[in-house]
């Protein structure tokens, strides 16, 4: 996201609205009755959220999804799910906003840790193997380099997504790796979905980042069949 040419290093919290705009502006090029979306990682959760509000979306696939609002508010595996823990996060981020204003620049939170500690959790090692190697490194990638700005996730603390995912009538396919640390996001999301056009597909042996780029693991045939069926 850029304003006046200077990057904010912040996620677009209104991503579901952006997806809805695409559904509108692409109608001159595509069939408005056959709109499908795919979201990966954090955008997977946002894609489901978009499907909850935009009835033009007929099929949604979320790959190795994150619920960014949940992990921000509760920490990984909900280990920080308390009012006090959230208060401390708010306090720290709001204090940083004042510092950023005084400095005239955003402090960055840091991307994937480098060098990688020997005792790093396996999912951090998996991220390193993607973002810090030719697999996924890019000079402008925030995760590969300085990361998002420290205060960028503040609104996520106060804006839980997926609140009305149980009302999605269109088709949803959730795909997650068996060994992914983030698997619980898809499992929770699936438990809230209703209707026989919803599916959770667990890929045996796969971790979180395998579904980013591993061509022999990503279930392309399943994705093709899913969109073919529901975008007819």
Regions found by a protein language model. Give the residues of each.
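Active-site nucleophile elbow and catalytic-triad environment of alpha/beta-hydrolase enzymes
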Residues: 69, 75-76, 146-164
């Amino acid at each position: 996201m850029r304003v006046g040419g200077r990057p904010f290093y912040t996620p677009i919290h209104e991503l579901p609205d952006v997806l809805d705009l695409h559904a509108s502006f692409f109608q001159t090029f595509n069939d408005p009755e056959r709109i499908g979306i795919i979201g990966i990682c954090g955008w997977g959760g946002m894609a489901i959220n978009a499907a909850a509000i935009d009835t033009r979306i007929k099929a949604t696939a979320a790959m190795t999804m994150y619920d960014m609002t949940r992990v921000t508010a509760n920490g990984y595996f909900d280990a920080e799910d308390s009012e006090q823990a959230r208060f401390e996060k708010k306090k720290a981020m709001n204090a940083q906003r004042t510092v950023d204003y005084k400095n005239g620049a955003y402090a960055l939170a840091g991307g994937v840790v480098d060098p990688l500690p020997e005792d790093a959790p396996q999912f951090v090692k998996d991220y390193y193997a993607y973002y810090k190697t030719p697999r996924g490194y890019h000079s402008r990638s925030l995760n590969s380099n300085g990361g998002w700005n420290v205060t960028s996730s503040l609104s996520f603390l106060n804006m839980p997504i997926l609140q009305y995912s149980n009302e999605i009538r269109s088709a949803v396919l959730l795909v997650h790796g068996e060994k992914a640390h983030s698997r619980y996001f898809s499992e929770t999301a699936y438990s809230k979905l209703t209707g026989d056009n919803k599916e959770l597909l667990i890929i045996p042996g796969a971790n979180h980042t395998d579904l980013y780029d591993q061509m022999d693991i990503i279930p392309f045939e399943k994705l093709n069949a899913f969109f073919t069926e529901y975008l007819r």
